[in-house]
Amino acid sequence: MNRTDGLVQRRRVVNSSSGSGLGQDGSNDISHNDKLSGHGMDTDCTMQKDLNSNPKIDESQDSDKETRLTLMEEVLLLGLKDKEGYTSFWNDCISSGLRGCILAELGFRGRVELEKAGMRKKGLLVRKLLLKNDAPTGDVLLDEALKHLKETDPPETVPSWIEYLSGETWNPLKLRYQLKNVRERLAKNLVEKGVLTTEKQNFLLFDMTTHPLTDNLAKSRLVKKIQEAVLSRWVNDAGRMDRRTLALVILAHAADVLENAFAPLSDDDYELAMRRVRTLLDLDFEAEAAKPNANPVLWAVFAAFTK
């Protein structure tokens, strides 16, 4: 693998662009200043901890004093330029990637489940996503997605929901399920948590709200967690990895922001990290989902981005 033909070259192109922003989340997602009625703190931490705990390897055991971020917030934080405070204009994967994170987060919190494979052994991509618990999570985006899931009958598949929530469906009746201004709303969450700040930048003909990084430690911890997962703490067994970290690696790759975490690595470590990421992407997701204590929702989300 020639790093200069991949990561470095792409980063130069990205850094040279200035016409990007947070609001490009679907064809109708163009407003950068959408005002939210409020962001509640996560009131579901206990359930989340129980669902994500792994007795073999728990990479979050030292995170009690750290800022708690959702999977969506972590992926967005990876994609944001630290000083500029916006995502790359050239990244057309982050929109759907963030919607996948939303479904995975709902799976972590026990709000959704995948229908049983049954006697016909249905594959992950055709099994329906079912509402398991419609209790509010305390997160505006998650609760909005839950509301859409509750209103939909018959249930839909995970790939369909990623399309609906992204607004990338050809079915006009499903456009009402689009989650709008996702990047801006997640950025505001990170502002409230003290990770980002809010500024106005002028781009020739228009002003744009940006969210530069203020908590460098939070970003450093996130990058370190990803690097260690595929380097010093690599276990070569997805079943032994912390589930949330596994989801972060795969969905950051789906959102095309994973390489941002590998930028500081040496060439040798970079190539090793990318080989191990490829190992995860090449797993038999159907077999992994069938293992005891597996969360089929997660594997269905992963499969939706690697089909």
Predicted regions and their residues:
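Short, amphipathic alpha-helical interface elements at domain boundaries
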Residues: 2-178, 282-307
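Non-catalytic, well-ordered alpha-helical scaffold segments
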Residues: 73, 100, 104, 184, ...
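Short, amphipathic alpha-helical interaction segments positioned at domain boundaries
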Residues: 127-171, 178-185, 189-192, 204-246, ...
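Glycine-rich, aromatic-bearing surface loops/beta-hairpins
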Residues: 212, 216-307
